[in-house]
Amino acid sequence: MTAPAPAALAPARLLDGRRIAEELLDGLKLRVDARLAAGKTRPGLAVVLVGGDPASSVYVRNKRRAAEKVGIEAFDYDLPQGTTEAELAALIDQLNTDPKIHGILIQLPLPGIPDANRLIQRIDPRKDVDGFHPQNVGHLALREFGLRPCTPRGIVTLLAHTDQPVRGRNATIVGVSNHVGRPMGLELLIAGCTVTSCHKFTPPDVLEASVRNADILVVAVGRPGLIPGEWVKPGAVVIDVGINRLDDGRLVGDVGFEAAAQRAGWITPVPGGVGPMTVATLMQNTLEAADAAG
């Protein structure tokens, strides 16, 4: 007797980060308006850009536009290539004590400065709206929500817009950077997932098995097509943080999108998935920092 053919996989639904980010920004604008109506100060965000790297300039421009949309005042500090660590440290000290500034954003990478961590640690943790300061990461590790790293927090918001439960699910994170992979693991642990982290020392067979077992897959490495779409578990939620420009000019993620989209339940596009959520979450953190300051 011939076995029945397996049911055809339905194409994944797109997690439209642009739309969800716009909804978040609209809500933040209402909160800023209410804050101003109550006689409180306008939230202020210092945006520090060193050099003229094209990619960094695009990111900063998007952040400034988002700030304008929600009513946050952006204070621009566009510094020349060759700005020293000492000069940046002096600027951070000035911003730390400026009552008009509720959030400080240092756009990374910093050209000519090999260790940006010293500067990040110099930012007042109460104004660290990127969520990179060790004190804020430590609060997250202790399950004390404060200013959380923007990309992982934005991904949690994306997950809330699916019809998939998070608690009790198997989650695999590929990539363990300080800004995405590691705090993403903390976020998913807090949400009740069983978390597996994969990195450059993970054997290929273990990586494949971990991906195939993932109900929630987050990939943040920066290598186009690192994860074949055929590895994706049917019905999984796929969050592709990678954004890579190919020789032909196309932007692609770290996951083979076409094959993954035929297997996943939900998947983020690249571009238009995680990136807009990171920017919107930066505004969310800035407003929360202003609210905490009074």
Curated annotation (Swiss-Prot):
Gene Ontology BP terms: L-histidine biosynthetic process; methionine biosynthetic process; purine nucleotide biosynthetic process; tetrahydrofolate interconversion
Catalysed reactions listed for this entry:
(6R)-5,10-methylene-5,6,7,8-tetrahydrofolate + NADP(+) = (6R)-5,10-methenyltetrahydrofolate + NADPH; (6R)-5,10-methenyltetrahydrofolate + H2O = (6R)-10-formyltetrahydrofolate + H(+)
List cellular component terms (GO): cytosol
Which Pfam families does the record cross-reference, listed alphabetically?
Answer: THF_DHG_CYH, THF_DHG_CYH_C
Write the record's keywords in alphabetical order, separated by commas: Amino-acid biosynthesis, Histidine biosynthesis, Hydrolase, Methionine biosynthesis, Multifunctional enzyme, NADP, One-carbon metabolism, Oxidoreductase, Purine biosynthesis
> What's the EC number here?
1.5.1.5, 3.5.4.9
Q: In which pathway does it act?
A: One-carbon metabolism; tetrahydrofolate interconversion
Which PROSITE patterns does this one have?
A: THF_DHG_CYH_2 (PS00767)
One example of the protein's molecular function in GO is:
methenyltetrahydrofolate cyclohydrolase activity
Domain of life according to the entry: Bacteria
Subunit comment for this entry? Answer: Homodimer.
Free-text function comment from the UniProt entry: Catalyzes the oxidation of 5,10-methylenetetrahydrofolate to 5,10-methenyltetrahydrofolate and then the hydrolysis of 5,10-methenyltetrahydrofolate to 10-formyltetrahydrofolate.
What is the protein's name according to its record?
Answer: Bifunctional protein FolD
Q: Which organism is it from?
A: Xanthomonas campestris pv. campestris (strain ATCC 33913 / DSM 3586 / NCPPB 528 / LMG 568 / P 25)
